[in-house]
Amino acid sequence: MTANEVHLIYFSPTHTSKQVGEAIVRGTGITNVINTNLTQQAAQDLVITESALAIIVVPVYGGRVAPLAMDRLASVRGNNTPVVIVVVYGNRAYEKSLMELDYWAIQQGFKVIAGATFIGEHSYSTEKYPVAAGRPDERDLTLAADFGKQISDKIASAAEPDKLYAVDVRKIRRPRQPFFPLFRFLRKVIALRKSGVPLPRTPWVEDESLCTHCGACAKMCPVSAIIKGDELNTDAERCIKCCACVKGCPQKARVYDTPFAVLLSQCFVKQKDPCTLL
C-alpha cells in the first residue's frame, strides 16, 4: 500500500519538534504534505483518512507531553489512520510521555505504526548553562530522515491497511541513564524545593534598555502571555515557561534564570541518542 499524503502535526514553541518532524517527512519521500502547526492555536476538527499518514511531534515538559499540546490535539482524529508518534525531550528523560501520546492516538482512532524519542535543546538551556544545546543537530536530523525512509518502507511492504501492523511503544529502547548524575540531580532538586527559594514564574527583561518593543516575543508566545507594546510584562497565569520569547528575542533582552538550568546542565552532560520503534 501507499500513503497518498502525509499530515505533519506539531507543537513547537522553540522549533525543535518542528525540525524533527520536517526531517522525518523528508525521509518518507511523500510530496503531498499538509502541515498543522498547533503552536499558536488548536486544530479545527481535523479528521485524517485511512489512506493518509499522520506524523505527530510534541515536546516533553517535566516528563509529560506538554499539556497545551495535548489540549490542542483534542480535535484531531483518525479513521484507522496510520500514525507515527514522536516526543522531543531536553536530554533529561521523557518518562511516560510516549505512552501518553500513544494512548491519546489510539483513543482518537489512529493506528500507531511507529514511535520515536528525539532530543531537542532544553527550554532552559543558555550559553552559561547549556542543556542539549544545538539539538537536534545534523546527526539527529539525518537519523530522523532515515526513520522516515523506514516508515515508508514499512507502509509499502503492507499489501493492504489491515496488514500494516501497530507497535507497542513500551518496547522502545530507552537510552541509558548513568545512575550517579541522576541521583545527584534528584537530591539537589529535593534540596532546592526544601530551601524555599522562590522560583521565577516567567521569563523577564533583565536590561530594559535592550528591549526595542519590536513585539517579536508577543508574536511567538503560544499563550499570548505577552502583549505587544507592553513587552516588559509577562502574564504569569498564562506563561508555560517554554522560553520561546527568550530564544527568539532578536536583542537577547529576555532571560529565564532558573536554578533548574544549573542542575540540568551539571547532571545531564552526557548526550542521549534518539530511539525509534517500527
State each model region's role:
Residues 205-207, 212-240, 244-261:
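Iron-sulfur cluster-binding cysteine motifs and their immediate structural context
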Residues 175-222:
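Acidic, Ser/Thr-rich low-complexity intrinsically disordered segments
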Residues 85-87, 193, 201-203, 229-230:
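A short, structure-level motif marking secondary-structure boundaries and short turns
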Residues 2-7, 12-39, 45-194, 257-264, ...:
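FMN-binding flavodoxin-like domain, especially the glycine-rich phosphate-binding loop
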